[in-house]
Amino acid sequence: MKRTYGLVVLFVLVIASGAVALGQSSKKVAEEDVAKTAAILDHVWLDAAHNRDTETMAWLFADNFVEVHPGGAIVDKKEQIAQIEDPQRANLELHPDDIQVRYASPDVAVLTDVTTIRGLSGGVNYNGKQRVIRVFVKQNGRWRAAGAGIVPIAAQ
């Protein structure tokens, strides 16, 4: 009887530990999927900015999107799109590097990258490396860009 009881307990523990392990691996896979999606959206964002693709920007940006530019200017979705359409805007060179997902959950992803920017945009003359933080959120089942911040990297 004791032996049967011991085998039942052992069996339950094995099943329970397997279930816990499966739950953890699925969470890790989900985080990796979010990270991949956010990294792809980062490239979509930069390509749309470079190509002045305002339709993609309007599709990507959440309605309450906000971006903080160097010098502290804050722009919303409408202002950001207007800056991209601006005929005074010089051809902007954008070269992202070191894209890292810093936080990923089922509904939020935070990325940083180092983007070399050259050109004029929104009255700011860019000529060098910028540290960028981008925030993506899942709204109604779809990933959207919620915000960003850009800070020049000081020459070392």
Where are these regions (language model features)?
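Bacterial N-terminal signal peptides that target proteins for export
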Residues: 1-9
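Intrinsic disorder/low-complexity segments
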Residues: 1, 14, 22-23
